[in-house]
Every structure is written in C-alpha cells, then in structure tokens.
Amino acid sequence: MQTSPLLEHLIESLRCLPGVGPKSAQRMAYHLLQRNRNGGMELARALTEAMSKIGHCSHCRTFTEEEVCTICNNPRRQHSGLLCVVEQPSDIQAIEQTGQFSGRYFVLMGHLSPLDGIGPKEIGLHLLQKRLQEESFHEVILATNPTVEGDATANYIAELCMQQNIKVTRIAHGIPVGGELEMVDGTTLTHSFLGRRQLG
C-alpha cells in the first residue's frame, strides 16, 4: 500500500527522537492524525518556537532563551565560588532537583572521545579554561558520567584546575540507595570502597 508522502515524511521526522524506531514513529504519526490533531498542532508550534528561540547561555552553555541563563544571573550563585562541570544540560536539571548545589555550572555538551574525533576544543574546554581564569572559583566539582570517557574528561579538567591552583573534586559514585551488593558491578563496588567516608 502506498502511503501519503507527507505521512512518510512525518514518520521519518519522528525517528530523529532518541529510542524511536520505525514502528514507534508510525504509531505516533497515526495517533496524532487519527486521535489528537490539536495536540499535533500544539507540538508543531512548540517545536518551531523552541528551535527558533532557545539558544545557549553565553556563560555556562546550557539551554536558555536569554543571553545569560537564570542560574548564571543569580547574584547569590555568582558569589558562591563553586562551579559544577556537567556533560549535558539535562544533568543540570537532575542536580537542581536535589536542592543540594547552590553554585554555577559549565556544560561540556559531551565528553572527550578521541576515537570519535571529539577532543578538548569540541567540548569547549578552552571556554572553561577562560572562565576559570576570569572568574574567582575556589572549587570546581566534576559531575561527568562514571564511564571511561567521563573519567578521562574529569582527569583532563582536573589538570586544568590544578594548574590554576583551584580545588577540584569529583562527585561520588557508588551503590544506589536500596541497591543490593550482589547486584552491583565490580567497577561501581570499587568506587564505593575508594569513596568511603568515616562515620562519627
């Protein structure tokens, strides 16, 4: 059966979303056309507006509609002296939801991966270095992912910080709350032992 070129284009466009394969994209397209045309129109409007108006903060590189995001513009955070380095803008959202961090951020938009052609320049480490030189931070907290690439990225940034005599720490990685030891992989368990804290 030959389908409409517009329908085919819609299905193909939906496939750009993470985790959406041909079948899922087809289900979404048919759902919007059959049962939720208003929702589809609203989605199209929201996508168009977001794509044209959302850019990157000139200080931390997270997503924002302004030149400088609300976190970087917050005077209380400007005087905290803390900078948290994350891989993705979504990492900021996750950290903010904990309510445990009151400093500022720098978003790498990825991690070092030489095999994929991603070096220091591609993740903006020259911008991070400039920021460390121009602003007064007394501690940089590295919140990169606990992967080989995340570790390599954290080690590279740690060197930059130490060259400027800035204290550098890495968020702890270990056993999740409610997790059972027998289900935890060896690398995570090793991190848990290395990152153990004294009680009392």
UniProtKB/Swiss-Prot annotation:
It comes from Pasteurella multocida (strain Pm70). Keywords: DNA damage, DNA recombination, DNA repair, Metal-binding, Zinc, Zinc-finger. GO terms for biological process: DNA recombination; DNA repair. A zinc finger (C4-type) spans 57-72. May play a role in DNA repair. It seems to be involved in an RecBC-independent recombinational process of DNA repair. It may act with RecF and RecO. It holds the Pfam family RecR_C. Residues 81-176 form the Toprim domain. Belongs to the RecR family. The gene is recR. This is Recombination protein RecR. It comes from the Bacteria. Gene3D superfamilies: 3.40.1360.10, 6.10.250.240, RecR Domain 1. InterPro entries: DNA_Rcmb_RecR, Rcmb_RecR, Rcmb_RecR_Znf, TOPRIM_dom, TOPRIM_RecR. GO terms for molecular function: DNA binding; zinc ion binding. Signal peptide: none annotated.
